[in-house]
Amino acid sequence: MKKLLQLSIIILPVSFFLIFFILLTEENQFPGADYREFDLPVFELKILNNDVSIANSDLEGDYVINVWASWCITCRIEHPYLASLAKNGIPIIGINYKDEKIDALEWLSKYGNPYQVTVQDYKGTLALDMGVTGAPETFLVNKGKIVAHYEGEINDYVWNQVFDPIIQERGMFK
């Protein structure tokens, strides 16, 4: 009995240390990824280039929402990748986040416009309702529900690891 007690005094702390160490060193490959499903918030905002209002109820099917701004350096880095997605038939809705209209229009004119439509979220209200903490952030929308969310630059690797498995599983963009 005494030997068992001595053995448990040694094994128990070592076990806790190993478990704690494993949990601390476990690497989350995509810390910016969030797979909680939630409804796209209700909104009505003006379209960036013509001041016509658009509401969430006007958006149908499967699409990507990209939150961007002209002042965002990472948005500039990911922009060519978004253009390639659009060229390959992925519909992208832009949310211009806390930006000046003239700056946003100039930016799109200079770098190209991969968005089917861009709404102007001057105050960041819609972005806040969606859980946005900054730009860029990208959302995958399936049947009016946000099914994936990524904070940070979208590139081929992130797209293939974070979004593509969900797209394949749900049969999106067909």
List each language-model region with its residue ranges.
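N-terminal targeting signals for export/organelle localization
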Residues: 1-46
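Short gly/ser/thr-rich secondary-structure transition/capping motifs
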Residues: 44-53, 118-121
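Short active-site neighborhood of thiol/selenol oxidoreductases, capturing the structured segment around
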Residues: 54-76, 82
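Hydrophobic beta-strand anchors of alpha/beta hydrolase catalytic cores
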Residues: 64-65, 92, 138
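Structural microenvironment flanking redox-active thiols in thiol-disulfide oxidoreductases
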Residues: 76-111, 122-128
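Short, conserved active-site loop motifs that form the nucleotide-linked donor/cofactor pocket
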Residues: 90, 116-117
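Thiol/disulfide oxidoreductase modules built on the thioredoxin-like
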Residues: 110-114, 121-167
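Short, solvent-exposed cationic patches
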Residues: 167-174
